[in-house]
Swiss-Prot record:
This is Membrane protein UL43. It is found in: Membrane. Its main location: membrane. Keywords: Membrane, Transmembrane, Transmembrane helix. The chain crosses the membrane at residues 39-59, 61-81, 96-116, 121-141, 148-168, 184-204, 339-359, 383-403. GO terms for cellular component: membrane; viral tegument. The keyword NAD does not apply.
Length: 414
């Protein structure tokens, strides 16, 4: 598909796609576009699978609470797990196989029925297999987005966020489809079989080296680009060379304070606190004759995303970085919100949950801006960014579990 006509240029930039006169101007050829599109489709499918398992399979059955807790805690922890680029391929391949085997076994047990479990309701063995498949899918997904989260050009990073957010949202909303359990099992089987034992990196690697470098998706197979990241969107202009960071660990976490503890843990801790308050509200309304607990949670979750998008637009127009000022504003908002808990507790819970979604995504985007300016940040910084992003959705699934039983009861009564 590709050949090189300038072997002396660093980074293999002389390699270009065959098939036209436009191979030298950086425009992707059809084969490369197809490979990259398949890679992003794979990202979306993995995220949708993770959302589906987290919201449907694990939130039913006699051990739903324990399994949901294991899913949330495990997903949050695995999201922060470092994946060194030099050793990422073999574990990813193993996880892809585990995802297929565990997911297939879970679907088989779910369809055939487990001893002692009602029809259509997963038993403990099914839930354990599904949990293992979810963990494996998360590890593969985390490895696939690792280079895209760290040094990818801004449009590609935003596209990656959109693809993963879309997949997680589609999968997480499966509880509201109200499809027959057999249809749900068939859909899950199709997704598991479609993913197979491959990862998005397998599709990305089929693009030519020039376009792999342009998309910064070959970091799991080769050293990171040694060019200034601000020039990454101009494939024909390489910019100044930077010191190589491959096969060596940076002595610092990241530069310019990009991984300050308050930037990472305040959103996660406040989200966990919001969930605790939501759980108290759920327990307090158990005796209610009708109506779901937290009926507006999906709208609040989407509203948090919309607020993060508007904040990012304001950041684009602002002359300085707003990441830290927004964090302090959020802390002040929480102080006021705690006072509202004694006056309008329902609104305060929603405000706390929506604010947690907003500040978490805002901090992800802010941290990524800082990491993009510091290519010597190291894999721990990318893992921190990635983990915070996945934590938003792991905790979002936990909030959704509080909604589902009451909504199901409300639907049956209607």
């Amino acid at each position: 598909m590709c050949r090189g006509d300038s072997p002396g240029v660093a980074g293999g930039s002389g390699e270009h796609c065959l098939g036209g006169d436009d191979g030298d101007d950086g425009r992707p050829r059809l084969a490369c576009v197809g490979a990259i599109a398949r890679g992003f489709a794979h990202l979306w499918l993995q995220a949708a699978t993770l959302g589906f398992v987290g919201s449907v399979v694990l939130s039913r059955g006699p051990y739903a609470d324990a399994m949901s807790g294991a899913f949330v805690i495990g997903s949050t922890g695995l999201g922060f797990l470092r994946a060194p680029p030099a050793f990422a391929r073999p574990p990813t391949r193993v996880c892809a196989w585990l995802r297929l085997v565990g997911g297939g076994a879970a679907v088989a047990l779910w369809s055939l029925g487990e001893a002692g479990a009602p029809p259509g309701v997963p038993g403990p063995a099914t839930q354990c297999l599904a949990l293992g498949a979810a963990y494996a899918a998360l590890l593969v997904l985390a490895d696939d987005v690792h280079p895209l989260f760290l040094l990818a050009p801004r449009p590609l990073f935003v596209g990656t966020l959109g693809v993963v957010v879309g997949g997680l949202t589609i999968g997480g909303s499966a509880r509201y489809w109200w499809i027959d359990p057999r249809a749900a099992a068939a859909l899950t089987a199709a997704v598991v079989a479609g993913l197979g034992t491959t990862a998005a990196g397998d599709s990305f690697s089929k693009a030519c080296p020039r376009h792999r470098r342009f998309c910064v998706v070959s970091a799991v197979e080769s050293p990171p680009p040694r060019y200034a990241p601000e020039d990454a969107e101009r494939p024909t202009d390489h910019g100044p060379l930077l010191p190589s960071t491959h096969h060596q660990r940076s002595p610092r976490v990241c530069g310019d304070g990009a991984a300050r503890p308050e930037n990472i843990w305040v959103p996660v801790v406040t989200f966990a606190g919001a969930l605790a308050l939501a759980a108290c509200a759920a327990r307090g309304s158990d005796a209610a004759p009708s109506g779901p607990v937290l009926p507006l949670w999906p709208q609040v979750f989407v509203g948090g995303h919309a607020a993060a998008g508007l904040t990012e637009l304001c950041q684009t127009l602002a002359p300085r970085d707003l990441t830290d000022p927004l964090l302090f504003a959020y802390v002040g908002f929480q102080v006021v919100n705690h006072g509202l808990m004694f006056v309008v507790p329902d609104i305060a819970v929603y405000a706390m949950l929506g604010g947690a979604v907003w500040i978490s995504l805002t901090q992800v985007l802010g941290l990524r801006r800082r990491l993009h300016k510091d290519p010597d940040a190291g894999p721990w910084a990318a893992a921190t960014l990635r983990g915070l992003f996945f934590s938003v959705y792991a905790l979002g699934f936990a909030a959704g579990v509080l909604v589902r039983p009451r909504m199901a009861a409300s639907r049956r009564s209607g």
